[in-house]
């Protein structure tokens, strides 16, 4: 899980979601692409 000021999709399988007011990226194809804004 990477924590970044700005999160963006890395590949076409990444999905931008919002959990408890936090923007996150989850990726089913490559778990290394997981990101959280903060």
Curated annotation (Swiss-Prot):
Superkingdom field: Eukaryota
Molecular function GO terms recorded: structural constituent of ribosome
Keywords of the record: Chloroplast, Plastid, Ribonucleoprotein, Ribosomal protein
GO cellular component: chloroplast; ribonucleoprotein complex; ribosome
Keyword Chloroplast: yes
Record's subcellular location: Plastid, Chloroplast
InterPro entries, per the entry: Ribosomal_bL36, Ribosomal_bL36_sp
GO annotation (BP), single: translation
NCBIfam families linked: rpmJ_bact
Family the entry assigns: Belongs to the bacterial ribosomal protein bL36 family.
Name of protein: Large ribosomal subunit protein bL36c
Organism of provenance: Mesostigma viride
Record gene name: rpl36
């Amino acid at each position: 899980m990477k924590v970044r000021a700005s999160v963006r999709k890395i590949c076409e399988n990444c999905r931008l979601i919002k959990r408890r007011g936090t923007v996150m990226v989850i990726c089913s194809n490559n778990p290394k692409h997981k990101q959280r804004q903060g």
